[in-house]
Structure formats: C-alpha cells, structure tokens
Design a protein with these regions (language model features):
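Short carbohydrate-recognition loop motifs
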Residues: 38-53
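Extracellular glycan-recognition modules
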Residues: 4, 16, 29, 50-106, ...
Length: 244
C-alpha cells in the first residue's frame, strides 16, 4: 500500500515514466512543452499543456474501488482558465478533479463531491492535494486546508486515469491550460503533516535517483547517509555524525 502512481515529468519524453514502479506510464498527447519544474532545481522539469489538445493518458483505471485516496500535484496557470470543466487529474465517471469554473476547484465522484471557491495564484506554482477517507474529503492548497466535507466512498469506472484533460470531466476534451508537475496518487490517506511536507518541498513522493535526468551528475538525498545516489561521489561527514 502507499504510492500507486508518480509522474515527475523529468524525462521529457513522449512516454512519461511512472516512478512508483507500478508501470502506469503515461502517453503524452498533442505537443506540450517542457518547462522548469516547481522546485527550480536543475533537471526538474514540468509539462506545459496548451489547453487545446495536450494531455497525458494512461491505460489503467487507477482510481477504482479505493477506500482511501490521496491526490498530490503542482500546477501553474499563466492566466485564468476560460470556460468551465477544465480537467486537471482524474478518471472520468469515477474521480474527477479540476476547475468547474474559472474560480472554483471541484473534486467530484458519484458518491459525493466538494467545490472550493478559490483559484491558484496566477503565474505561481501552487501545490494542490485532496485526501479521501471514511470521514470524507479534504482539499489542500499549499499545505493549508481550503475545503472539507463528509460523505463519499469507493467508486469505479471503465475509464482510465489521465492528466491535463481528455478523459477527466468527460470522455474527451476539457483541456487544461497551464503547467503541471510531480503528480502523485496514493491508495492511503496522507496526514496533514505529510501534505505540508510535500507542499513545502521538504518531501517528494519518492527519491528521483531511479531516473536519469539530463545534466544530473550527482545527487545526495541525505536519506540516512551521505552517499551519491546516482554515482560514486559519496560524501564524508565532517564535525558530526548525525545523519537523519
């Protein structure tokens, strides 16, 4: 249990890798651009959708029959969305998350939904998360709760999990204009502290060292040691042995 899908978009490829090791790789549709990711670090890329025909589609109904669920991702909107029902991430007729209108985020399922009257700040990266369990839905923006409600329950559909539109609010269409980064899906309900850590950058869904990023020649995540996770440039602690 835990992370069941993670797309950091650092590979800049027509097939974007799922780093959760579940093999749910995404197919990049249209001609999206690759831009700097939310962290600003070298090698951190994001995907920029044009709002016309760009999307990322998978071949799996990832969100079926989940008693608990967490969706976590970053978005950047260059301008306010035009029109309604702009899909961000989800699975048509099961779990649909997007902009129901230009200023309202919506998490919708056949078992219940929540509308949150806020919009991400234009031209700034915003971390968005939804946590679902037996108590209901909680929506976060930049680590802060912006909406919550009771209800809900496991849902399912025959559609596939997609990002950026094209099978989220409807079978096709409803494309999102903007950039997206670090999409993660969990089959557990993350805690408020977990969400705050993702939003602050103190945590990432998993270490990215399993993926070769263009230009990256060394990486020290400090996960209990000071080893270079992708090479042999291991560090040596000076003055302390407290590596947590």
């Amino acid at each position: 249990e835990g992370l069941i899908g993670y797309w950091p978009f650092d590979d800049q490829s027509e097939t974007t890798q799922d780093l959760s090791e579940n093999g749910n790789d995404g197919t990049v549709n249209g001609e999206p651009e690759w831009v700097a990711g939310h962290s600003g670090f070298a090698g951190d890329s994001a995907i920029q959708f044009d709002g016309q025909d760009d999307s990322v589609t998978t071949e799996v109904s990832l969100l079926n029959d989940l008693a608990e669920l967490t969706l976590s991702f970053w978005i950047l909107m260059p301008e306010q969305q035009e029109g309604n029902r702009k899909g961000l991430i989800g699975q048509n007729d099961a779990v649909e998350y997007g902009m129901i209108n230009p200023t309202t985020m919506q998490y919708w399922t056949p078992a219940g939904n929540i509308n949150v009257n806020y919009g991400p700040t234009i031209d700034e990266w915003t971390h968005v998360a939804v946590v679902v369990n037996s108590d209901g839905f909680v929506v976060y923006s930049n680590g802060e709760v912006v909406g919550e409600t009771g209800g809900g329950g496991p849902v399912s559909s025959g559609d596939t999990f997609n990002m950026g539109g094209d099978g989220i609010y409807d079978a096709t269409g409803n494309f999102f204009l903007g950039s997206m980064d670090d999409v993660a899906v969990y089959n557990i309900a993350l805690s408020p502290d977990d969400i705050a850590a993702l939003a602050s950058g103190d945590a990432v869904p998993i270490a990215r060292a399993t993926q070769v990023v263009p230009g990256l020649i060394a990486y020290w995540p400090f996960d209990g040691n000071i080893d270079d996770a992708i090479g042999d440039n291991h560090g040596e602690a000076m003055g302390t042995d407290d590596i947590g």
